């Protein structure tokens, strides 16, 4: 059973600008469907059962272009998402995102990841539109 999905999108903006926007957790609610609110330490995650408060750790390295999020849920389970901004030709960037399966019971894993893959594809388009506007 697959436990991850990798997606990427080209963004017609310089790497530093794309990185700065994505690395700021306060911007997560603007381009994702998953976050109702977010800051440097916590977030409110939107789930099918309503909003859930979580601890959010953003690990960002401008030098490496990496932005990773570690999410700790009220029950102590931990989820993660890993991403990277890479320079492309000219003043463009490539944003790649490794979507990890959510910390859910095994019987729900495949459906949850499939649903999140579709959502991520939409979110990446939203991110590009927002940054290129």
PLM features: what roles do these ranges have?
Residues 1-38:
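Hydrophobic ligand-binding cavity/cleft-lining segments
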Residues 2-8, 53, 66, 78-80, ...:
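Intrinsic-disorder/low-complexity, polar/charged segments enriched in Ser/Thr/Lys/Arg/Asp/Glu/Gln
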Residues 7-9, 54-60, 71, 79-87:
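Hydrophobic/aromatic beta-strand elements that line small-molecule binding cavities or substrate pockets
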Residues 14, 50, 63-64, 74, ...:
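Short strand-connecting beta-turns/loops that link adjacent beta-strands
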Residues 17-22, 28, 58, 69, ...:
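Hydrophobic pocket/interface hotspot
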Residues 39-42, 89:
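Residue-level recognition of beta-strand termini and adjacent short loop/turns
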Residues 43-49, 67-74:
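Short beta-strand segments that buttress and anchor functional surface loops
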Residues 73-133:
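Beta-strand/loop substructures that line and gate deep hydrophobic ligand-binding cavities in soluble
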